[in-house]
From Swiss-Prot:
Residues 262-299 are annotated as: Disordered. CDD domains: RRM1_RRT5 (cd12409), RRM2_RRT5 (cd12410). It comes from the Eukaryota. This is Regulator of rDNA transcription protein 5. It holds the Pfam family RRM_1. May be involved in the modulation of rDNA transcription. Residues 9-92 form the RRM domain. The lineage of its organism: Eukaryota, Fungi, Dikarya, Ascomycota, Saccharomycotina. The keyword Protein transport does not apply. Belongs to the RRT5 family. SUPFAM superfamilies: RNA-binding domain, RBD (SSF54928). GO terms for cellular component: cytoplasm; nucleus; ribonucleoprotein complex. The gene is RRT5. It comes from Candida dubliniensis (strain CD36 / ATCC MYA-646 / CBS 7987 / NCPF 3949 / NRRL Y-17841) (Yeast). Keywords: RNA-binding, Transcription, Transcription regulation. GO terms for molecular function: mRNA binding.
Amino acid sequence: MASQSSNHYRVYIKNLSYSTSEKDLEELFGKFEPVNVLIPSYTIHFSRSGRHRPLGIAYAEFRTPEQIESVVKEFDGHVLKNRKITVKKHMAYDPNNRRFSFKRKSNIKNGKMNQGGSSTGEILAPVAKEFLVRDDETVSIGQQKKNPPRKPELSMDTIMIQKVHGKVTDESLKDFFKEYNPSQIYIFKSKKPKLNPMNLTGSHVNVLVKLDVTQTKLDEIISNLRSQKMNGRYISMKPAYKSKVLEVEKAIAESKSLENTGEGENMIVDEKASPTNKHGKNAEHDNSEISLIGTVSNC
């Protein structure tokens, strides 16, 4: 490895395939006669064989700044082993500057390395920082960046109340929301997680309440009621997800269908469970994500 004092110039390559070797890069940059090529790697933890894995980046050194200009121009965006690689001038990391940014070019001209110290050390020092900052930009050819998950759509007229004490009734809910003319009240229960079947806080249910929002918006209703207690307890309210309202309405429709066949009496609705009748049998072989608890009230 040549020393820093030899005035060599370096490029940084990222988004490399793990199967790319230093020889592959030497051949790729062959006509520009690279002085040296390095693909940093790390040891896989808990590997008995002491296996190494590359970081997906590399460094290549050339003799003149004109060479690195030509290399960047010709190979930035080049496809190598089904990956579109990025090639750019290397900018040395300064550990004494905590606010160091890869976009700053102070004290660095045309990718030239700083004087002093060995070239090997200069190459290895910035590996960790550049890898951590840039790793999320690795994209294979033909692979599209995933769109961020869309936020669930909120209902404009229905409030969700989670983990209400199990003794709550539709009458107490009607009284609590009486100023906003509740038209539908759905009470349903979440299934207890299998990993933690013990319940030391008592029985809880969830509630959906459809309100009249022609005069007052739902967020304002929630704000107005937040300081009030129901059955001596504060409750947590928020706009319901439309998807949850649809699940409950679907479960209700199924329960009404069963009532017409004489099997829908005393319908119980648990989330993640199928509706059951009073005999404990599955009311319908359906994978509905919500099953009804007790009370469905048309106010």
